[in-house]
Amino acid sequence: MLLLVGAISGTCFAQDGNTMKTFDPAFAHTVYFWFKNPGDTDGRARFESSLKKFLKNSKYAKTDFIGIPPKATRDVVDDSYTYSLIVTFDSAESQENYQNEEAHLLFIEECKDLWERVVVYDSFGL
């Protein structure tokens, strides 16, 4: 019985080794985007497509997370942004190189007309 439970659990949580990445705690780059027109579905689709293409082609980004805010239920939670992005790097130098790489610059050029505000928080891991 335990063997069966273990086999089922392993199957449920297994991930494709080609797509699984290990979170790199050395340097995290967290970006929040506020769109001019957050309800623009065409703009959102263009942003998501361009962002995913950029992250796939980045030479420096180790792991990434793209998110949207859940409806806040507490006063301390800010749900005013349109998208969040968390990207990890193996060093601050890699993050600096990422800022100037072609894939990143192309993403900015393709999508800069969509946002009215961008806020970045960079952090070193402890």
Please provide the spans of the model-predicted regions.
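Bacterial N-terminal signal peptides
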Residues: 1-9
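Short S/T/G/P-rich N-terminal loop/turn motif that feeds into the first structured element of a domain
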Residues: 10-82, 86, 90-97, 123-126
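Surface-exposed loop/turn and secondary-structure junction residues enriched for glycine/proline
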Residues: 84, 101, 117-118
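Short, exposed beta-strand-loop hairpins at the edges of beta-sheets
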Residues: 96-100, 108-111, 115
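Charge-dense polyanion-binding interfaces
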Residues: 110-126
